[in-house]
Amino acid sequence: MNERVLNDPLQALWQSTRELHGRFNVQPTIYVQIPLILEETAEAIKAGLFESRQAVVGEIADVIVVTLGLAMALGIPYEDVIAGIHETIRKNDGKTTDTHYLNPANKIARKT
């Protein structure tokens, strides 16, 4: 495993995705990436229900790749993706049983 993967695997995946697009002379667009996200998500769901843990892990990685491609298609820089991840972590960490509850659909929802 190379040094860039060990230091920041998400950034390495971002760069790998850019390089993949470059090798095939592909410019990601929302019209390409959104169907790919739907396809890869369906494959991840199928793997989660019927396939091995290793297959699920691979499909999850594929969902991340095509989602990063959507960010690229929209011109969103890697740093903004990371900022969004940090914001989600902050929000998740702030959710407690005092502020949220588990609704009947098993979704953590804000108390009103």
What are these regions (language model features)?
Residues 1-60, 64-112:
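Flexible "arm" and connector segments at domain edges
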